[in-house]
Amino acid sequence: MKILTAFFILFFSCSFAQRSAETQPPPQARLVKSVDHLTLEAALELAKNSTEKAAQLNKQVSLAVLDTAGNVILLMRGDGVGIHNTEAARRKAYTAVSTKTATLTLLRNARANPDTNNLNTLPELLLLSGGVPVWYRGNVIGSLGVAGGGSPENDDAIARAAAIPEKGILTSK
């Protein structure tokens, strides 16, 4: 009887240990994460959607698409657009990816709250309308910035028009 009891204890202990090992993630999963990245192909499609919206508004714009680290994937300037708008578009995109917030929303929130009014003093952040984070499956995978649309509302509308909803790439959460 003692042998039978010992056998059952050993058998169930081994099977429990084996199951728990199978359900635990590998140790490297705590050290490395897989993430989705915005591709050049997607950046070109985002830019195409934005420039089509700009054309509907009879505007030429500068446009920047960045990855989540703030690196430029695509930078373009429409015909006749002032050269300062290219840097403004990049900084708007940087602000959007850094804060995971559309720059128009960030601008309005900063103006409404004296505690955040000094956000515009941080290097690289530009609290002007026209920057949006780019979302995929609930995560920011990059950003897009637009400058030269003629008004804050135009820059924001042109940036938001970049979305590729049929592929799950969005400009709002």
Where are these regions (language model features)?
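Positively charged n-region of N-terminal signal peptides that target proteins for export
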Residues: M1-L4
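Hydrophobic h-region of N-terminal signal peptides that target proteins for export
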Residues: I9-A17
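Flexible, solvent-exposed loop/hinge segments and secondary-structure transition points
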Residues: Q18-K173
